[in-house]
Amino acid sequence: MKRLISCLTIICALNASAAAETTSNPCSRWISFLKPVCQRFHQTWTEGHDDMYFSGYAWHNRYVYSNEKIKSYNETAWGGGLGKSLFDEKGNWHGLYAIAFLDSHRHLEPAVGYAYLKTASVNKDLKAGLGYSVLVTSRVDYDNVPIPGALPWAALFYKRITIAATYIPGSSREGHENGNVLYMLGKISL
């Protein structure tokens, strides 16, 4: 519960910070080579659509884990979150998100991050995207220390609904298995 409250506090603080920013150039204090990053974040936050995320599946790679291990893991990674996203002038997708879900050991795992997808239109309503996400998460089995990361991300967009997936790489050393999980999530643009 503390982690959920922490995630919500971060979201509220970011929203308050964005609302309080009244200057015409909110990224003026950023180092010059990071200004485009700030400007894209600001654009996504102020012009983007509100999103509701939901998760529900985490597939543990059967080539890495034993049947006994897989049976002990939670593959129904129920959770949800909020975000903001937009398609830029080139049609590529940018998203800011804060989510929390049940990890492989049924512990609550929060994550906040940014995702970028290079998209291709299949037709007017259907797009496919491939890109990455950079995020910060924390896990009980790592003493709840904030852990930064970068992951591949793929998605299918249909009107306001998105189905996305990422693969969390890991180690397959015997006795030290971790990662190697396909994580699925969905998003509805409000």
Curated annotation (Swiss-Prot):
GO terms for biological process: lipid A biosynthetic process. Its main location: membrane. The active site is at H60, D103, S104. One of its GO terms (molecular function) is acyltransferase activity. Residues 1-18 form the signal peptide. GO terms for cellular component: cell outer membrane. Keywords: Acyltransferase, Cell outer membrane, Membrane, Signal, Transferase. It catalyses: a lipid A + a 1,2-diacyl-sn-glycero-3-phosphocholine = a hepta-acyl lipid A + a 2-acyl-sn-glycero-3-phosphocholine; a lipid IVA + a 1,2-diacyl-sn-glycero-3-phosphocholine = a lipid IVB + a 2-acyl-sn-glycero-3-phosphocholine; a lipid IIA + a 1,2-diacyl-sn-glycero-3-phosphocholine = a lipid IIB + a 2-acyl-sn-glycero-3-phosphocholine. Pfam families: PagP (PF07017). Belongs to the lipid A palmitoyltransferase family. HAMAP family: PagP_transferase (MF_00837). Transfers a fatty acid residue from the sn-1 position of a phospholipid to the N-linked hydroxyfatty acid chain on the proximal unit of lipid A or its precursors. This is Lipid A acyltransferase PagP. It comes from Legionella pneumophila (strain Paris). The gene is pagP.
